[in-house]
């Protein structure tokens, strides 16, 4: 029998954003969990930009929170500047973003991990995994310790065969100051995984005391400040500070162009593809040669540190070039660099080798989450981590896995995109990736997912009570307003005209007035007989959106129902696609390569035809009838 110190239900390797959420989710649902990290002090570290949220990403954070995750709580504890992006646009694309104090964020994540029942931490580098045939059964540390578990979640970030590049200089590292997981990467390459390389980068850090802020544009945060968590309180946020905006200059671009031959990106030194939507400054100068300047967001890394993160000048140019280009930027003429920028290359595995649960198809019980699957970003990693940790715990207990559908969550879009299409560049989330984004808003992530999370064991009693109280308050307010009818001649109709300047031509239910573009909930509450309304801004927002967008939401729900007809029809793991008569060679090869788990996933494979899906459905139905017979 394995000593209890070495035996667990779930082992999570790596304690970044994916690993932290994976370990917490597994333990929260009852699994005895071990979190292995090479350094306990870097649990929850923000390796690159000190920010959480943004377009698409903020939606993921809200979904993580709706499922009981940690990221939103940590952001609320660490956010030092808050903004609602796209505030003037529709609710589907509004997104919350906060600048975060690195130390406060890391401390908040560590506190939650250390306070979680059934979750142990151990500091050790992992060199290999333990296997019994094609099933994982544990992990081996650098010092030879064997930890056993029937499920392992690997969240290695940029550490698998990581290599840092600064000009012609290159060396092995997981990130600056941390060793790479070289041995583990080599062992995984021996397995039946499709391995490739990706690249990401980070800008030089600047001593904020050496900057001239009068040459920049101040960017204050929003007031009132939003929160990330549905149960958060802006009163608990740290003090809010400003960010600043500046630009590169023509001189900056001249310096970069003159040094391109020394850039690892252009010398052939770097093999991996970089993130399309977060290019290096040298990439921007080359790709957008017609632009005279590029915007830089000057972001503080914390309340009690001097470091500034110049968002927009990620680079792997030699240090002497970095210093020259930094000092050519407006307001940076006397800048002192505290840490150089660099690029890092690392191994990732083709996510088409994953099930929707994030369990690998090749190795039973082994789950991947985060950058190992080809994604970029803290939020994408954390969302995958939560899902992988949940499903690892369910795997151990013999329960079916759970993954949200594309119409249920951005997490569902993320996973489906990865396992169906794969990626050859770092994948990041945007609202444009979702077909049903009016359904997948930040504001209703709890309504979409919290009840499911409760059934899965992810939601504690306090959050469940808070969620139910909110839903009941929304229903009560909708019911209250629906009871009011105004006519051109009654007292309420006259109040509406006097207060809002709206003349009614017929009897109207008050709640229908919110469907008018010029009226909202706050306006209606100015009508004496209707106000003052509810105090909770979240409740008021849900009342307004449910009314104002009812027609659009109903039409989208009908479309989802039509699309769901065959979405969940399962395809057996060992299904013989060659036995389906009439499939083209192209379609057959794609099906055999991707091995979709459901007909819905098969429909989304590029090049798949309606005729091929019909043939597949006929064959599956024939198989079902044969089994019954």
Swiss-Prot record:
The keyword NAD applies. GO terms for biological process: tRNA methylation; tRNA wobble uridine modification. GO terms for molecular function: flavin adenine dinucleotide binding. GO terms for cellular component: cytosol. It comes from the Bacteria. Its cofactor is FAD. InterPro entries: FAD/NAD-bd_sf, GIDA_C_N, MnmG, MnmG-rel, MnmG-rel_CS, MnmG_C, MnmG_C_subdom, MnmG_C_subdom_sf. Gene3D superfamilies: FAD/NAD(P)-binding domain, GidA associated domain, C-terminal subdomain, tRNA uridine 5-carboxymethylaminomethyl modification enzyme MnmG/GidA. Keywords: Cytoplasm, FAD, Flavoprotein, NAD, tRNA processing. This is tRNA uridine 5-carboxymethylaminomethyl modification enzyme MnmG.
């Amino acid at each position: 029998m394995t000593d209890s110190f070495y035996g667990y239900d779930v082992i999570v390797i790596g304690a970044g954003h994916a690993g932290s959420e994976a370990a917490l989710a597994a333990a929260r649902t009852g699994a005895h969990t071990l979190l292995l990290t090479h350094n306990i002090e870097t649990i929850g570290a923000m390796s690159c930009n000190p920010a959480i949220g943004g377009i698409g990403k903020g939606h993921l954070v809200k979904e993580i929170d709706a499922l009981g995750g940690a990221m939103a709580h940590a952001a609320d504890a660490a956010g030092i500047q808050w903004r609602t992006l796209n505030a003037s646009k529709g609710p589907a694309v509004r997104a919350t973003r906060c600048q975060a104090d690195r130390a406060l964020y890391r401390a908040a994540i560590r506190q939650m991990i250390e306070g979680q029942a059934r979750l142990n931490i151990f500091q050790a580098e992992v060199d290999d995994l333990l296997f019994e045939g094609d099933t994982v059964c544990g992990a081996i540390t650098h010092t030879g310790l064997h930890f056993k578990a029937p499920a392992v979640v690997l969240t290695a970030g940029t550490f698998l065969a990581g290599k840092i590049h600064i000009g012609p200089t290159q060396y092995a590292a997981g990130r600056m100051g941390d060793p790479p997981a070289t041995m583990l990467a080599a062992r995984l390459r021996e397995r039946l995984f499709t391995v490739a390389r990706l690249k990401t980068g980070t800008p030089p850090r600047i001593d904020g005391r050496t900057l001239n802020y009068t040459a920049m544009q101040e960017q204050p945060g929003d007031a009132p400040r939003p929160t990330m968590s549905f149960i958060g309180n802006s009163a608990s946020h740290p003090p809010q500070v400003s960010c600043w905006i500046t630009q590169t200059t023509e001189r900056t671009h001249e310096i970069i162009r003159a040094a391109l031959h020394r850039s690892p990106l252009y010398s052939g030194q770097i093999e991996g593809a970089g993130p399309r939507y977060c290019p290096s400054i040298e990439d921007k100068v080359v790709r957008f040669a017609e632009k005279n300047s590029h915007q830089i967001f000057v972001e503080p890394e914390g309340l009690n540190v001097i470091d500034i993160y110049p968002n927009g000048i990620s680079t792997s140019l030699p240090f002497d070039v970095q210093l020259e280009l930094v000092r050519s930027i407006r307001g940076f003429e006397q800048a002192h660099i505290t840490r150089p920028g660099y690029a890092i290359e690392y191994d990732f595995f083709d996510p088409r080798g994953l099930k929707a649960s994030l369990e690998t198809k090749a190795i039973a019980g082994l789950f991947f989450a985060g950058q190992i699957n080809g994604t970029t970003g803290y939020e994408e990693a954390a969302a995958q981590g939560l899902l992988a940790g949940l499903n690892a715990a369910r795997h151990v207990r013999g329960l079916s896995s759970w993954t949200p559908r594309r119409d249920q969550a951005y997490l569902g879009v993320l996973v489906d995109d990865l396992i169906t299409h794969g990626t050859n560049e770092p994948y990041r989330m945007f609202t444009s990736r979702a077909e049903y984004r009016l359904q997948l808003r930040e504001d209703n992530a709890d309504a979409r997912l919290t009840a499911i999370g409760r059934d899965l064991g992810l939601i504690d009693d306090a959050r469940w009570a808070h969620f139910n109280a909110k839903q009941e308050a929304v229903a009560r307010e909708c019911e209250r307003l629906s009871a009011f009818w105004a006519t051109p001649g009654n007292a309420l109709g006259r109040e509406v005209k006097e207060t809002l300047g709206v003349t009614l031509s017929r009897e109207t239910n008050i709640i229908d007035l919110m469907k008018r573009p010029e009226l909202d909930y706050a306006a209606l509450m100015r009508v004496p007989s209707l106000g003052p309304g509810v105090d909770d801004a979240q409740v008021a927002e849900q009342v307004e959106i449910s009314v104002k967008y009812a027609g659009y939401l109903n039409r989208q729900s009908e479309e989802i129902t039509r699309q769901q007809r065959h979405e969940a029809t399962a395809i057996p793991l060992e299904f013989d696609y060659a036995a389906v008569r009439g499939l083209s060679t192209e379609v057959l090869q794609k099906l055999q390569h991707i091995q979709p788990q459901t007909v819905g996933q098969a429909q989304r494979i590029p090049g798949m035809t309606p005729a091929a899906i019909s043939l597949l459905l006929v064959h599956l139905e024939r198989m079902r009838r044969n089994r019954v017979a």
